[in-house]
Regions:
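Alpha-helical promoter-recognition and RNA polymerase-docking modules of transcription initiation factors
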Residues: 1-141, 148-163, 172
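Conserved small/polar residues in nucleotide/adenosyl-binding loops
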Residues: 178-180
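Alpha-helical residues within the helix-turn-helix
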Residues: 175
Length: 180
């Protein structure tokens, strides 16, 4: 059995979080983030980084909550990563990059806004996957902003092809990109 099969089997065993549990975990991660940010803003040393026993406990609980949120949502990462297969990176690399996006989502999630975490995380995971593909999938790296422009150009060309039935001219493409 391969390590990918083992990994996929392992993440399938973890329970999804209920909406209430998501909110609880999100609040704990936020509390931890406030304490860690306080220390980082102070330059990583000094009194701001000297945590009380209660604060150390909050950080530990926050780390556990963060790990639980990540573990419970790895299926979402795999699902999205599979959609990006065949575009220049191996599935395991895509899963790794998607997990980085998921981690960012856990850190930035604000449960007070009332959104489900998976809805919020979806964007961050896709962002991580798209960023990885644009920076790692080519022999010559193209900057992300240029890659985004290429994507818009391809989309405009495809839409014009569907409308007209023939390849668009350069002028037609330029005009359609102005309106995007």
């Amino acid at each position: 059995m391969s390590s990918l099969s083992d990994f996929l089997g392992e993440i399938g065993r973890h329970q999804l979080l209920t909406p209430e549990r998501e909110l609880t975990m999100g609040r704990k991660v936020q509390e931890m983030g406030v304490l860690i940010n306080r220390c980082q803003e102070a330059g990583g040393k000094g009194p701001a980084c000297e945590y009380s026993e209660a604060e150390r406990k909050k950080i530990k609980i926050g780390e556990k909550a963060k790990n639980e949120m990540i573990t419970a949502n790895l299926r979402l990462v795999v699902n999205l990563a599979k959609r990006y297969q065949g575009k220049g990176l191996e599935l395991l690399d895509l899963i790794q990059e998607g997990t980085l996006g998921l981690t960012r989502a856990v850190e930035k999630y604000d449960p007070a806004r009332g959104h489900r975490f998976s809805t919020y995380a979806y964007w961050w995971i896709r962002q991580g996957l798209n960023r990885a593909l644009s920076t790692q999938s080519r022999t010559i790296r193209i900057p992300v902003n240029i890659n985004e422009k290429l994507t818009k150009l391809r989309s405009a060309k495809s839409k014009l092809m569907q409308l007209k039935g023939i390849p668009p001219t350069g002028d037609e493409l330029a005009l359609s990109l102005i309106h995007i």
